[in-house]
Design a protein with these regions (language model features):
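A conserved beta-strand/loop element that lines the FAD pocket in flavoprotein oxidoreductases
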Residues: 1, 99-111
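Rossmann-like dinucleotide/flavin-binding elements
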Residues: 1-5, 11, 15-25, 36-85, ...
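Short, conserved catalytic or adaptor-binding loops enriched in Gly and charged residues
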Residues: 25-28, 95-102, 150-151
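Phosphate-coordination loops involved in phosphoryl transfer and adenosine-cofactor binding
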Residues: 29, 42-48, 108, 116
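General small-molecule cofactor/ligand-binding pocket signal
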Residues: 33, 104-106, 155
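Charged helix-capping and loop-helix junction motifs
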Residues: 88-92
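Acidic, Ser/Thr-rich peripheral helices and adjacent loops at domain boundaries
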Residues: 94-95, 136
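Short polybasic amphipathic segments
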Residues: 117-122
Length: 180
């Protein structure tokens, strides 16, 4: 289907998901591996900088550590997994696990450049930090990607409306389905 009007007056539910937020303003951004690409099998080195300490970034860092790799988390905010709607048991466990296993976590730190074999970040004190790494995984979030605008007969659900977690997107879809 190339045009929503092909459905006539029937309601249409669009669940086209989201696209990764690419950090195009960061020199060397093209050297990064997007989080979903890693999850789909893209190989990484032994020391991996994970850019983004939200749920996806932390779960990827956790998986890397379980595989015997050395993750390093770089997060702009002042805490890991700070988004709303995440199960407290998950976020608390991840924070505590990283602390217990001495996983390097850089909070209030911004990625400045991706180089071959390292990244340069700016810490909360304004000073640059050089972090050696073999690979860089970008987990900088997602941007809704709807195919059409919401209207009387067009309903957006899931990440194309607002990026969320599995629970929130399923709830939104259920609400729309019940209203139709």
């Amino acid at each position: 289907i190339k045009d929503i009007s092909a459905f006539g007056s029937d309601p249409v539910i669009i669940a086209t998901g989201a696209t990764p937020r690419l950090l195009r303003k960061v020199p060397g951004y093209e050297k990064m591996i997007e989080g979903c690409d890693y999850l789909n099998g893209t190989e990484v080195g032994d020391t991996v900088a994970v850019i983004g300490g939200g749920l996806t970034g932390c779960e990827i860092a956790y998986e890397l550590a379980l595989q015997g790799k050395n993750p390093i988390i770089v997060e702009m905010k002042d805490d890991l997994v700070s988004q709303t709607g995440v199960c407290l048991a998950n976020s608390s466990y991840l924070r505590e696990w990283f602390a217990l296993h001495k996983t390097p976590v850089y909070l209030e730190t911004v990625l400045k450049e991706v180089r071959d074999g390292s990244i340069v970040c700016t810490g909360k004190d304004g000073k640059d930090i050089n972090i050696d790494c073999d690979s860089v995984i970008s987990c900088a979030g997602y941007i809704p990607a709807p195919l059409a605008e919401k209207s009387g007969k067009v309903h957006l659900v899931g990440d194309c409306l607002a990026v969320g977690n599995l629970r929130s997107v399923v709830w939104r879809a259920y609400d729309v389905a019940m209203k139709i």
